[in-house]
């Protein structure tokens, strides 16, 4: 139960940060030429899978309030799929940064194509790709690595989807006296994490 609460809370926090950044930087966060700083958060699934829900919700709300319905559809899909692929590629050496670059560059320009704009798709592809390289690689990547190291040193717990979804069953067993809750609720750090779970943060 505690893990599930943490999981949901962190998702909400990530969504709020994404929306706040998009709101504060609204003039440069939307349109064919954009610099959406909040997209740097899409790398968080590398060590925080709950942020997949957070960045997707944050992107949806940002596009819903400040952009067109086409952006709500294509932009949110691009961010959601990119976040999932980033999580799946979390064990690779920086390859997890590729999905946000490619998916946003491929899907976001479709907004203006479907909207009837005469803007060239390839031109928008290049512009979005360039902005994603700056936001994701030059800003998001170092921030993500630094944040992960800082949270690990602080003893902040990281959970996989499997662990978060299993939390209700663990809580039920604890209340029945069938499981010891000390190890379940113990903060996970690099020093005390079980060997089998260390790979989830690699």
Where are these regions (language model features)?
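Small-polar-interrupted transmembrane alpha-helices in polytopic inner-membrane proteins
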Residues: 18, 55-63
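Hydrophobic transmembrane alpha-helices
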Residues: 1-53
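Juxtamembrane loop-helix boundary motifs flanking transmembrane segments in multi-pass membrane proteins
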Residues: 1-4, 56, 118, 122
